[in-house]
Amino acid sequence: MAKNRNEIPEKLTWDLTTIYKTDKEWEAELTRIKSELSLVEETDPGHLLDSAESLLTITEKMLSISQQVEKLYVYASMKNDQDTREAKYQEYQSKATALYVKFGEVYAFYEPEFLKISKEVYNKWLGELQKLKNYDHMFERLFAKKAHILSQKEEKLLAAAGEIFESPSETFEIFDNADIKLPMVKNESDEMIQLTHGNYSSLMESKNRGVRKAAYKALYSNYEQYQHTYAKTLQTNVKVHNLNAQIRSYDSARQAALANNFVPEKVYDVLMEAIHQHLPLLHRYIELRKKILGITDLKMYGIYTPLSNLGYKFNYEDGVKKAEEVLAIFGKEYKGKVKAAFEQRWIDVEENIGKRSGAYSGGSYDTNAFMLLNWQETLDDLFTLVHETGHSMHSAFTRENQPYVYGNYPIFLAEIASTTNENILTETLLKESKDDKERFALLNHWLDSFRGTVFRQSQFAEFEQKIHEADAAGEVLTSEYLNSLYGEINEKYYNLAVKGNPEIQYEWARIPHFYYNFYVFQYATGFAAATFLAEKVVHGSTEDRQKYLEYLKAGSSAYPLEVIAKAGVDMESTDYLDAAFELFENRLSELEKLVEKGVHL
C-alpha cells in the first residue's frame, strides 16, 4: 500500500533545495521576473534591429529570462508532482505556467522583427560584433523559416485562430477521457470491474483468454458505437494540418511538421521502406506466438499475452547497483555522472499517495537532471531506471558542454539516449542469464519492445501519412474510409485477417498520437538507432563510445541529423535500420530454437 509522502525515507526522495533553498526564495524570484518582463514589454519591442549591439543585448536578455522562467517552472512542477494533493504547489504550478505564457506574449515580437533583417545586413553585423557568433546557429534556424513566415497581420490572425485549430484534438481528449464511460468487465478474480483506459493494458496481459477477449470486445464496442464522432474529430484535425501547410507554402503537412524540427522527409521515407522490407520478420514472430500459445487462430487480443512466467524481482538498491554496473561501459565520465545522480538525490524513487504516476527525467539548464520513478521491484522498473538515467545523462552532458541557447535537444534525439541504455541492459542480462528459461524471458521482453515500438509506431506513421494525403487529394475521411484503410494496414503488418479480427478496424479512433502531427515515427527511428548504437557501444571500440558521448554533449548546437551523425548514425540511410532488423532476426531465431526445445512449456 502506498505511503504518505512524509513516511518516505529522505534518501529515496529528490533534493529540490538544490534549486531553491526555500519556497520563499521561489516566490521572490517569481515577483522579480514578472517585474523584469513588464520592463521588457515597455522597452524592447520595435528595437531589436536598431543595431548589432541591440540585437545582441535583446537576444541575451531574452535567453537569460527564459532560463530563469524554466528554473521556476521546474521547481513548481516537481513540487506538485511529488504530491498532487497539495493546494500550495498546485497554485505554484499555475503561477509558473502563467509566467511561461506571459514570457511568450512579451517576446512575440522577437521572431517577426528578426526576420525583417536581410542576410547581407546580418552577415555585416556578424563581422562587426564577434559575440553575435555565439547565436549564429539559432539565427540560422530562424532564417530557414523565413520563406514560411507570413506578414505580421497574417501571423496575428493565425495566432488568434490557434485555439480553434486546437479544438479537434481537445474535443477528442475530452470525449475519449471524460465523456465516454466504458463497460463493466470481469477481471482474473471473476469480479466485475469498470473498464478504463488505465486498466485495459493489464487486462490484455491476462493469462485468461476469456478476460482478454471480453475486455477487447468491450473497449472496441465503444469505438464502433461512436466511430462517426471520432472520424469527424480526426478528419478536422487532418484538415487543420493540411491547411496550415498550405498557408505557409509547404508541399504537405508532413513536410511542414518535419521542417519545424529540421528533420528531412527522407528519414520518414527510409523508415517506411525498411519496415515494408522486413514485415516478414513480424509475420514470423506472430507465427511463433501462435505456436507458443498452442493455437492456430491468433486474435489481436492475443498479441500482448505474456509468454513467460519468469518473475524478476529487484529492490531499489539492487537495481541501482545493476544500473551502475551496466552503464559503466560508457567510461569514467559517464560513470561519474551516474554515480552523482544515484548518490546526490536526483531521484524520487518510491510511490506515495498523491504522487504523479509513471516516470520521467526532468530539470532545467540550472538544475540537476532529476528523475521521478514509482519503484515496484519488477524487471520493468530496472529498465525504466536505465531509460530515465539515459535521458538524465543526455541532459547533464548537454548542459555541461553547451551554452543555454543550445542546452536542450529535440524529441527526435531524446529517445535514442534512453533506449540505447535499455538495449545495453538487455545485452548484459542475456550475457548473465543462467538458464534457457531466463534467456527465453529476456528475448521475449526485448522482441515485444521492438515489435511495440518499431513495427507498431511505424504502422501508425504509415496510417497518419495516408490520411493526410487522402484529405489533401479531396477524399472525405468518413469512418468507413478510416476503418477500411486501418484494417488493411493492420492486416499487412500482422498477417492476421481483418475478417477474423473485425474490432481492430476501429483502433485508429483510440490513438491520441494521430492528433500530434507527424510525431509518432520518431519512436520507431529512435528505438532502431538505439539498437544500432548499443551494439556499437557493447561490441565496438573506445572510439565508438567516445563518439556516442559527443552526441550526448552536442545538445542542439547543430541540426538533429548532424548531431546523431557524431555517434555514427546516418538517419537518411537504411543501414541503421537494417542492423536493427538483423538483431531482431537473430534474437527471434534464438527464441524459435528455445521453443523447439520446449523451454516455454
From Swiss-Prot:
<keyword id="KW-0479">Metal-binding</keyword>
<keyword id="KW-0862">Zinc</keyword>
<feature type="active site">
    <location>
        <position position="388"/>
    </location>
</feature>
<keyword id="KW-0614">Plasmid</keyword>
<feature type="binding site">
    <location>
        <position position="391"/>
    </location>
    <ligand>
        <name>Zn(2+)</name>
    </ligand>
</feature>
<dbReference type="InterPro" id="IPR042088">
    <property type="entry name" value="OligoPept_F_C"/>
</dbReference>
<comment type="function">
    <text>Hydrolyzes peptides containing between 7 and 17 amino acids with a rather wide specificity.</text>
</comment>
<keyword id="KW-0645">Protease</keyword>
<dbReference type="GO" id="GO:0006518">
    <property type="term" value="P:peptide metabolic process"/>
</dbReference>
<dbReference type="Pfam" id="PF01432">
    <property type="entry name" value="Peptidase_M3"/>
</dbReference>
<dbReference type="InterPro" id="IPR004438">
    <property type="entry name" value="Peptidase_M3B"/>
</dbReference>
<keyword id="KW-0378">Hydrolase</keyword>
<protein>
    <recommendedName>
        <fullName>Oligoendopeptidase F, plasmid</fullName>
        <ecNumber>3.4.24.-</ecNumber>
    </recommendedName>
</protein>
<feature type="binding site">
    <location>
        <position position="387"/>
    </location>
    <ligand>
        <name>Zn(2+)</name>
    </ligand>
</feature>
<keyword id="KW-0482">Metalloprotease</keyword>
<dbReference type="GO" id="GO:0046872">
    <property type="term" value="F:metal ion binding"/>
</dbReference>
<dbReference type="GO" id="GO:0004222">
    <property type="term" value="F:metalloendopeptidase activity"/>
</dbReference>
<dbReference type="InterPro" id="IPR001567">
    <property type="entry name" value="Pept_M3A_M3B_dom"/>
</dbReference>
<dbReference type="Pfam" id="PF08439">
    <property type="entry name" value="Peptidase_M3_N"/>
</dbReference>
<dbReference type="InterPro" id="IPR013647">
    <property type="entry name" value="OligopepF_N_dom"/>
</dbReference>
<feature type="binding site">
    <location>
        <position position="394"/>
    </location>
    <ligand>
        <name>Zn(2+)</name>
    </ligand>
</feature>
<dbReference type="InterPro" id="IPR045090">
    <property type="entry name" value="Pept_M3A_M3B"/>
</dbReference>
<dbReference type="GO" id="GO:0006508">
    <property type="term" value="P:proteolysis"/>
</dbReference>
<comment type="similarity">
    <text>Belongs to the peptidase M3B family.</text>
</comment>
